[in-house]
Amino acid sequence: MNEQYEKSLSKLELDKVLSLLADHASSQAAKDRCMAIRPSADADEIRHLLEETSAACKCITIKGSPSFGGLYDVGASLDRAYRGGCLSPEELLRIAGVLRAARQAKSYAEGEGVQEASVLDLYFQQITSNKYLEERIFNSILSKDEIADAASSELASIRRKIRQQSAKIRESLQKIITSPSYAKILQEPIVTIRSDRFVVPVKAECKGQLPGLVHDVSSSGSTYFIEPMSAVNGNNELRELFMAERKEIERILAELSAESADHREQIKLDYDVLLELECIFARARLSFAMRAICPEVRTDGQLNLIRARHPLITGKTVVPISVRLGSDFDTLIITGPNTGGKTVTLKTIGLLTLMAECGLHIPADDGSSINVYEQVFADIGDEQSIEQSLSTFSSHTKNIVEILKVCDRDSLVLFDELCAGTDPAEGAALAIAIIEFCRKCGAGVAATTHYAELKLYAMRTSGVMNASCEFNVETLQPTYRLLIGVPGKSNAFAISKRLGLDDGILEQARSLVSQNDVNFEDVLTQLDQQRQEMEKAKEEAERLRRETEKQKEKSDEYYAQIKQEKEKAAQQARKEAQFIIDDARHAADAVYEELKQLRKQAKNGAFIPGSNEKQAGMRRSLNAVSYTHLRAHETLSDL
């Protein structure tokens, strides 16, 4: 990676975006790794990185963000333990922190949520939790300065004896400091500790009146800290207990160190994987913070940013831009007013390309794509060097010379106010020649300029496109909208007129401008007016289209409702017709059965009074039932 490329990364402020990324990581190691990220020129690698970021976004959406707290680089400590070294409590706590983070990550991966396979699965599958060792360390070590009594039964026993012995010594010394015979020689009636031994503070002039061992003297020399002879044996026993305690603590630390060394390789792997996962999820959290999307990655030279936003410009004031490069043109000439957004446009193109090459989602709309460039070069900003006595023009030219030495077909070159700060005619000629050189190298180019000659150059040259940052002459304010295919026009006369400059002065100024320039600006003005009229017509057409769609939706809803009600009525009618059919069928069956019985009785010679009339009535009922049955069937057929 050459020096000029590194300078361009700085000018495009990639480091500031990486700093935002680092803010979304918790461990210092992950923050450092985020800051060390550099763009990749491998399209497959970039796609894989972006896929990882997207997968992490999905995980966060479904089941929240995992915790990576307690991650420390414990490799050196594990290596020392492997060689037989005894680790400090702080080192062991850091190892336990990695083990806890590994267990939590494993639990996160195995929890409910995302079901389908993900590129993150390989990372999570490499993690192995060791809850036994994790809890063993945390239960044994309370802090970097304190070992728990529960670390071993022997340590608990020793400390119990220490407390008992300390109480015994204090009790004996308490008798001395409360004795009236010693009241005059004591500086204070207290028991204190010096060199792990209990002592009492005695006035310097009375030190010979209390038999014992002197362990310390106050800075003023007025107080001697004396261990009375009656406490020597007790203090000796206490000292032996302290030595036994230290020995037991060393044994415990050595044991925990050895156990950690046994799992050295897995703990190292866990740390590496967790660190990578933390950086991936930091990328995902940044994506949410920026409302970013995963762009398409191309290698055919085509870049297309839809409603892209510069990630370092926050608030409601940011105006999205849509810009493309490499489809029907490989060079973009951007003109427009100062502070109108030209430089921001250049930076947005360059920075979003670099972000994607780092595996970061970009703040733009869906459908955006970036092209993979091996190097992105930018000549942006005033780098005038007083020490080198370089003018602004010379400083930029020196920078451009270095860029031209290394740019090629895999480069994106961004020029801000190309060849400004010198004679306009010569500056414009130089600018065109520099752009042509880059184009012959096959590089993609975007340049901002005030030179009218470059507008004409773009209009006459195949593969070169004009663009402009819109300016509202009525409000005298830039709108920050980027207009592809529309060259920027000079607004000096219009602005001066609105600000109240005398008409006579304006007319004289116009007469001093060449007729060709006047005609060119008039053409640009007409084009701009036509563009605005077309945009208004387009907006009106869009409004009418939306209204038509809204009316169509209402009509569709109305007809759907009518159809639903009709179907509901038909279903009810079918139910009623079916009920009539079923009822008629039951009635017919009853009539047939009764008629059958009458015929059977008549056949047997039995006399049935009124049987003829009864049979005739039954036949009429049967005919009525048949008619009802037929009409119900016809109704069902109609439905």
Each model region followed by its residue ranges:
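Extended, Lys/Arg-enriched charged tracts that mediate electrostatic binding to polyanionic substrates
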Residues: 160-203
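Long, charged, glycine-rich C-terminal linkers/tails
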Residues: 177-193, 284-307, 465-467
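SMC-family hinge/dimerization module
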Residues: 190, 194-225, 235, 297-320
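Conserved small/polar residues in nucleotide/adenosyl-binding loops
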Residues: 628-635
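Intracellular alpha-helical coupling/juxtamembrane segments of multi-pass membrane proteins
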Residues: 158, 162-165, 241, 245-280
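Conserved amphipathic alpha-helical "coupling/scaffold" segments
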Residues: 1-154, 158, 263-266, 270-284
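ATPase nucleotide-binding head domains, primarily ABC-like/P-loop NTPase cores
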Residues: 290, 298-527
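C-terminal helical "lid" subdomain and adjoining coupling/linker elements of P-loop NTPases
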Residues: 85-92, 504-607
